[in-house]
Swiss-Prot record:
Keyword Ribonucleoprotein tagged: no
Pathway assigned to this chain's UniProt record: Amino-acid biosynthesis; L-histidine biosynthesis; L-histidine from 5-phospho-alpha-D-ribose 1-diphosphate: step 2/9
CDD domains referenced in this protein's UniProt entry, alphabetically: NTP-PPase_HisIE_like (cd11534)
SUPFAM superfamilies associated with the record: all-alpha NTP pyrophosphatases
Protein name as annotated: Phosphoribosyl-ATP pyrophosphatase
Leader sequence residues: none
Superkingdom: Archaea
Gene3D superfamilies the record matches: MazG-like
Family under the similarity heading: Belongs to the PRA-PH family.
Organism: Sulfolobus acidocaldarius (strain ATCC 33909 / DSM 639 / JCM 8929 / NBRC 15157 / NCIMB 11770)
């Protein structure tokens, strides 16, 4: 596992999916399913936008962190890895 915090968090999410650790928020999300997690991504996106417009920079950072976490859970449910996203971003940078 790399030192990248995104990769570390994704690995933890995969572990939670595998072990279904009781009391884990990640497990709660997984049990509720992809549609629920997708809805949470939308909610967190809206909260990040609002924070960027009318709240502090720290609050914006917190909301972006929530958004990234929920995106990673959705990615795990879709079997998409951070490396898949890194590869696509690198491809786009070459254009």
């Amino acid at each position: 596992m790399s030192d990248n915090v995104i990769d570390k968090l994704y690995s933890i999410i995969l572990d939670r999916m595998k072990t279904m650790k009781e009391g884990s928020y990640t497990v709660e999300l997984i049990k509720r399913g992809k549609h629920y997690v997708a809805q949470k991504v939308g909610e967190e996106s809206t909260e990040a936008i609002i924070a960027s417009l009318v709240e502090s920079q720290q609050r914006f950072v917190e909301e972006v962190s929530d958004l990234i976490y929920h995106l990673l859970v959705l990615m795990a449910l879709e079997n998409v890895t951070p490396q898949d996203v890194y590869k696509e971003l690198e491809r786009r940078m070459k254009k």
